[in-house]
Amino acid sequence: MSTQNWCEAPEIHPSQIRVGDVIGTRRPTDLRLTVKMISGPQSGPRQWTFFSRDEHGQQRTSTFAEDDVVRRYAKA
């Protein structure tokens, strides 16, 4: 079952996101992003970059740091 409301979507650590998950933006919107590829931390400050697509097919990139949380609507 997927969450429909941005406020109700669980906040999880970026390391728990997987390809195929549906995530939200940092601010409250109705935009849903399907993760297509993930760039994980290599060295230095730990960051995760998610390469995703919205429902209109537009590609988007979001970067989250170690202390950030990601809102996940649906798990892959």
Task: Go through each PLM region and give its residues.
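Mixed-charge, Lys/Arg-rich low-complexity intrinsically disordered regions
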Residues: 1-19
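Intrinsically disordered, low-complexity, charged/polar segments
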Residues: 2-7, 51-76
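Basic/aromatic-rich interaction segments and small domains that mediate binding to polyanionic partners
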Residues: 29-64
